[in-house]
Amino acid sequence: MPELPEVETVRRGLQPVMEGAKIVTAEARRGDLRFPFQPDFVKRLQGQTVRGLGRRAKYLLADLGSGDVLLMHLGMSGSFRVIKPEHEETPGEFHYPRGKDSVHDHVVFHMSSGADIVFNDPRRFGFMKIIGRGEIETEPHLKDLGPEPLGNEFDAAMLARACAGKKTSLKAALLDQRVVAGLGNIYVCEALFRAHLSPRRLAATLATRKGEPTDHAKRLVEAIHTVLNEAIRAGGSSLRDHRQTTGELGYFQHSFQVYDREGEPCRTDGCEGVVKRFVQNGRSTFWCPKCQR
């Protein structure tokens, strides 16, 4: 499933062709994706200017001139591509390049610029939903989300408060979207490695008895910032080989320090450890037992 860097890459890829442009017409080529489309889905989009394209955690939000907001989620296999008027196709860069077959093109936005924006989703775990601008805070998919990890409010003190007293593992706490929004398995493994913290460590150890952030919390927040920013600059992570027609995006997997590197040497200078894998809460965890404590 796409994590924050992949969704942010999508947003940046779509922003130039969506923001300020009008959705002349929209097509929903089937009745549902993960959820059924609203009966008036196409009608509410037709003729609307996209005032802005934002992101909240792993969701995209298109702010429409009508006061509505188009909420979009990529699911497991969703991707956008932009077909320009001169028929040059460019990706709205989420890099699991499955499903370019047009049979999986389920939604198309025909923009006033002449470009078409196509949503392709072979597994149909993605969804689109129109809500009122005033409903964002109460929308079930958004209302319980924690702070953005790249936002100003996310710091060591905030993370310590969120984890104080928690008896769950540090990795499980970071994957809890109520604690921090947008992190997933890949970037949690990578951030914990860079902070030299064990995924098995109790989340409560990020806070002192008085609730103040420990050095562990400070290192972890810095590592989260670093990993996410590096991944965004690389266009996210692609776990399958592919090439994009507009350049090399989605190559952060070449910078993985532990993820998907089971049995390989640890990349920490001076560490003679080996990357291990174990299953934690139903997900693969990759770490170096020697330098992550």
From Swiss-Prot:
Record: active site: 2 (schiff-base intermediate with dna), 3 (proton donor), 58 (proton donor), 283 (proton donor)
Keyword match Chaperone: no
Entry cofactors: Zn(2+)
Keywords: DNA damage, DNA repair, DNA-binding, Glycosidase, Hydrolase, Lyase, Metal-binding, Multifunctional enzyme, Zinc, Zinc-finger
Its biological purpose: Involved in base excision repair of DNA damaged by oxidation or by mutagenic agents. Acts as a DNA glycosylase that recognizes and removes damaged bases. Has a preference for oxidized purines, such as 7,8-dihydro-8-oxoguanine (8-oxoG). Has AP (apurinic/apyrimidinic) lyase activity and introduces nicks in the DNA strand. Cleaves the DNA backbone by beta-delta elimination to generate a single-strand break at the site of the removed base with both 3'- and 5'-phosphates.
Family: Belongs to the FPG family.
Name listed for the protein in its UniProt record: Formamidopyrimidine-DNA glycosylase
Protein source organism: Bradyrhizobium sp. (strain ORS 278)
